[in-house]
C-alpha cells in the first residue's frame, strides 16, 4: 500500500461522508426538513 493510495482513499471517504452531512446541514438551515 502506497502512502498516496492511502491518502486518496482517506480523502474519498471523507468527501463521501461529508457530502450528505453538508446537504443535511443546508436543509436544516433552510428549514426544508
From Swiss-Prot:
Signal peptide limits: none
Topological category with respect to the lipid bilayer: Single-pass membrane protein
Keywords: Chloroplast, Membrane, Photosynthesis, Photosystem II, Plastid, Thylakoid, Transmembrane, Transmembrane helix
Pfam families: PSII_Ycf12 (PF05969)
BP GO terms, sorted: photosynthesis
InterPro entries: PSII_Ycf12_core-subunit (IPR010284)
SUBUNIT field: PSII is composed of 1 copy each of membrane proteins PsbA, PsbB, PsbC, PsbD, PsbE, PsbF, PsbH, PsbI, PsbJ, PsbK, PsbL, PsbM, PsbT, PsbX, PsbY, PsbZ, Psb30/Ycf12, peripheral proteins of the oxygen-evolving complex and a large number of cofactors. It forms dimeric complexes.
Gene: psb30
Function description: A core subunit of photosystem II (PSII), probably helps stabilize the reaction center.
Record's subcellular location: Plastid, Chloroplast thylakoid membrane
CC per GO annotation: chloroplast thylakoid membrane; photosystem II
Annotated TM spans: 8-28
Name assigned to this protein: Photosystem II reaction center protein Psb30
Amino acid at each position: 500500500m502506497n502512502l498516496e493510495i492511502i491518502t486518496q482513499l482517506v480523502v474519498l471517504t471523507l468527501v463521501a461522508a461529508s457530502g450528505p452531512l453538508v446537504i443535511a446541514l443546508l436543509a436544516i438551515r433552510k428549514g426544508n426538513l
